[in-house]
């Protein structure tokens, strides 16, 4: 779905397009974030009804590339999860991927710049910029994020060690990680993010790169059949 949206998003001013999707992929975070039906037969019938809504996208501009995203963009240990999880999905698969990836984990030096005090400079396990509440196979990284409010949610997992990551990992499925004093979050329409030493970046669950990134909310940029 990310590839389709990136194909039509640049044309929205001159040739606006409406996207319809039947989701069968890993994690199905798009269903959770966008309100799509999970059952493919019901989803096809719903598409035929032609009900169109507007949803926000995030736009990430980095060295030589500009891409929009639906769920989120991030770097650090979350990208290691994507690399380890491969093509399969589901919570157990992602949990196993994180546990396996802990031996490769190294914290990065991160800089986050946003308005009104939304800033971070220091060691971070991950920096995640979320348009929707779910990513990574059902993880509720930003529980209050919405795809119709014109805002992005940034979540910084501070300098967590391997033992802390293993302990706090299960809590991301209900948003409990936000209770950790090393985790910070902010909401705004635009952020600048840089990470030194990040081994990989992910966008909507797929590996990509590079840094630094200027990330902005694109309010109502996606016309979607639901």
What spans do the regions from the language model cover?
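ATP/nucleoside-binding phosphotransfer catalytic cores, i.e., glycine-rich phosphate-binding loops
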Residues: 114-116, 121, 146, 156-226
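Catalytic core of DAGKc-family lipid kinases
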Residues: 2, 6-125
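Glycine-rich phosphate/pyrophosphate-binding beta-alpha loops
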Residues: 78, 128-142, 207
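Gly/Ser/Thr-rich active-site loops/lids in small-molecule metabolic enzymes
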Residues: 88-95, 137, 143-164
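Glycine-rich, charged/polar anion/phosphate-binding loops
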Residues: 95-99, 108-116, 137-142, 177-179, ...
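Histidine- and/or cysteine-centered catalytic micro-motif in compact active-site loops
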Residues: 74-75, 115, 125, 129-134, ...
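Short acidic/glycine-rich loop or secondary-structure boundary segments that cap or lie
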Residues: 78-81, 120-122, 135-138, 162-165
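Short, solvent-exposed amphipathic alpha-helical segments in soluble enzyme
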Residues: 9-10, 86-87, 143-146, 170-174
